[in-house]
């Protein structure tokens, strides 16, 4: 989800939100074609203004188009239509989360691995007429990246968001404090355009990009072990970039409390014999009604059972007078 895109077109934003969540699965080695989605929607208070009602309608249609295009249904979500305070409104928001399963041995990372590795931008294919993702070919690209992550021919992979490929490369390098030398002659769009859902992938220094990935690829540069970033003669260190990246919200979500922590030496706990009373104790019975719109009855029953009670759940059915009476 990119707010700037959603202000321009809630329809396109929702379609690309799905197109961002599925590649994130592919980048860690999980087959996006087998994914399921869940959405989080957040919109301004609608009132009686038709143009406001049009925003969630457009967003949901965009998300539905993407679900049909990729063959990946949304099976859950949560929405809110109260994102207004006085004259302030939230941007039209539909965030997509993709969920899937993969073997631990197949999973990958977004962390750059080795000095000398080559890094490429794999741009998600877009329909030039509609400006929407080319769903069929986009899924082909996602599955090709997933296969590369699983067979380890792709050493690391990340998904492009705000800031473009340049920001993605930097964040991939921050964890290991590796540096990066950008290729000469890259234009601003290649580096900084928010090609949402596109990939940045690392392959070995002596490796060759797979034929299934080559049609989408633009060479971004090579990883260096110096902890410096070089772009058209400009040089910045990893520490400088990390400071700039993290300082934006430092006053809101501080990463440094300014206090030194005291580390206590806690000895290992050794389990001893447990003595259980031979005397019988009362086991209270607990009635837990589950009404329409409520939840957590199973968790509540489990908690009572662990405390020694005998819980009983009754689902209150009220869709007819007879069923309500039976309940």
Where are these regions (language model features)?
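A glycine-rich phosphate/pyrophosphate-binding beta-strand-loop-alpha-helix module
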Residues: 8-83
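Short helix-loop-beta junction
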Residues: 174-175, 298-314
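Conserved small/polar residues in nucleotide/adenosyl-binding loops
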Residues: 320-327
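Short amphipathic alpha-helical face segments that pack within enzyme cores
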Residues: 16-20, 164, 168, 299
